Amino acid sequence: LILFTKNVIVFLVIIMKLKSWMSKIDGKNEVLRLNIPGTHDCVTQFVQFSHISKCQNMNIYEQLYLGVRALDIRVESRGDRLKMVHGIAKAFNTKNHFSKQMDMADVLAHCYRFLDENPSETIVFQFKNDSAKEMERCFDLMLNNYINKNPEKWYMDNRSPYLDEARGKIIFIRRCKMDTTKGYDIGKTGIDFSNWVEQTTAVPQPLVLNTSGENEIKFIIQDRFKYKPEPRWNECIKPFLDSMNKWDGKYIINYLSTAGGLKGPYNNSKYINPKFLSYKLNKDYYYGTIYMDFPTKELTTKIIETNF
C-alpha cells in the first residue's frame, strides 16, 4: 500500500510540469530570451578527482527531467571519438572508474530520449573542448561522427532561434574554433561562441561576447569562477543579478558555479545555491541562461516560473 501525502502529490505535480515546461511557452518567443536553468559541467556525476571536479549529482536525463534546458559540455578527442571530461578529469557513466570513459554518444542518448518523450522542449548545448589540444578537430568529430547521424535532431543555424523552430531539437553552441579549410558554412555550424574569453582573473566584471556571421548578436557573460564562494556571491553574482532588467537586446549568461578556494564545487554550491534561492527574481525581468552546480527542483522552478 502506497500512501500519497499532500507534499508527495505536490512534488509529483511539480516534477511533471518541469519536464515539459516549454510546452506552456508561446513558440514565437526566442529561446535565448527565456530565463533558462542550466548545468555547469553537466557530465560530472561520476568523475575522477571528485572533490574538485564533480559539479552534478544527476545524469543528463535526470537533469533535463528536473527542468534544466541548457547543458555545458566539455570534451576531449580520442581517436575518432569525443570523450567527456572536466579539465583533466575523465567522466564515466557509473561509479566504476575502470569502466569505459563516457562518450558523446552516451550524452546524446539521454538528450534524444528526453526530446522524444517531450517534443515540446529544446536543449541548449554549449560545446567546448576542455583538453587544450586539437581544438578544431573536436568540432569536425562532433559534426561528422555525431550530429550528422541524426541531423533532424539539431538546430545548427548561427542565430538565436524561435522556440517553434527548435522544439524537439538540440541548439548547438560552438565554443571552439573550427577548421576554416574544410569549407564549413559559418551560418550552419551552430551559434558561434568561438570568441569566448575565459574569465580566469578575480575581477568582478562580466565580459561581452559577440558572435560572428551576418546575424551577429551580443552576449553578456558572467563566469568569474576563480572567487571563493562568499565573494563570488557578493562581488559577482548578486551585483550581476541586481543589474538585470527587462530585455534590452543583449543576451545574458550567468554562471553560479565557482572553483575558488579548496572546498570544491559541492561545498561552494552549499553556500551559493541557498543565496540564489532566497534572492527575489522579478517575473518581468530577463535573467538569461543560469548555469548551476548541483541544482534542485526548487532552483530550477525558481528560474522557470519567471517566464510565466
Feature map (PLM): residue ranges:
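C-terminal domain-boundary segment and adjacent tail
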Residues: 146-166, 291-308
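Intrinsically disordered, low-complexity acidic segments that are enriched in bulky aromatics
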Residues: 98-143
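Surface-exposed substrate-engagement region within the catalytic domains
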Residues: 148-284
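Active-site periphery "cap/insert" segments of enzyme catalytic domains
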Residues: 82-90, 100, 131-151, 160-163, ...
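Long, acidic (Asp/Glu-rich), low-complexity accessory segments flanking structured domains
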Residues: 14-70, 77-117, 170, 174, ...
